UniProtKB/Swiss-Prot annotation:
Catalytic activity: Release of signal peptides from bacterial membrane prolipoproteins. Hydrolyzes -Xaa-Yaa-Zaa-|-(S,diacylglyceryl)Cys-, in which Xaa is hydrophobic (preferably Leu), and Yaa (Ala or Ser) and Zaa (Gly or Ala) have small, neutral side chains
EC number annotated for this UniProt entry: 3.4.23.36
Tree of life domain: Bacteria
Gene: lspA
Pathway terms, separated by semicolons: Protein modification; lipoprotein biosynthesis (signal peptide cleavage)
Free-text function comment from the UniProt entry: This protein specifically catalyzes the removal of signal peptides from prolipoproteins.
Any one GO cellular component localisation term in the record: plasma membrane
Protein name: Lipoprotein signal peptidase
Keyword field: Aspartyl protease, Cell inner membrane, Cell membrane, Hydrolase, Membrane, Protease, Transmembrane, Transmembrane helix
Length: 156
């Protein structure tokens, strides 16, 4: 029972922290906070698509696709408890970020983005949730690589 509580605590803790951080930075952005530097600007953009504004032609229907994908991932993770136990923090981060962006779609009609990297090349404008999704995917990959190596070492 204690182990079950532990992974659920990690999952929801990561979920809430990422969701709250992303929404807080977005609220500062919407309140007018702007900043410029040589490398990174804090600005405002409303992305009606997904990464790099892809699928923006779906307009308001994109939020329902986003909702369905998050719902399927939630159901799958709670059905596949082993996967959730192994990657509870990473999936908590991923889903907290996804739900935060989904909330934006329902409230603002798109996702609030604010970070613009422009040193050496102009990158797409992104937000905290986007960064957290990338970090969570990297965590899952790293955990899987080390898990496989550990398994291979035991077989030798």
């Amino acid at each position: 029972m204690a182990k079950t509580f532990k992974f659920i605590f990690y999952f929801w803790g990561a979920f809430v922290l990422v969701f709250a951080l992303d929404q807080w930075v977005k609220s500062l952005t919407l309140a007018g906070l702007r900043w410029q530097s040589k490398y990174l600007d804090l600005t405002y953009a409303l992305n009606t698509g997904v990464a790099f504004s892809m699928l923006s032609f779906l307009e308001h229907n994109l939020k329902y696709l986003h909702l369905a994908l998050i719902g399927v991932l939630f159901i799958y993770l709670f059905w596949q408890k082993t996967l959730l136990k192994t990657h509870s923090i990473a999936f908590g981060m991923m889903l907290g970020a996804g739900v935060s962006n989904l909330l934006d779609r329902f409230i603002y009609g798109g996702v609030v983005d604010m970070f613009f990297w422009h040193k050496w090349f102009n990158f797409a404008i992104f937000n905290v949730a986007d960064v957290m999704i990338n970090i969570s995917v990297a965590l899952i990959l790293i955990q899987e690589i080390f898990k496989k190596r550990k398994k291979d070492d035991r077989m030798d």
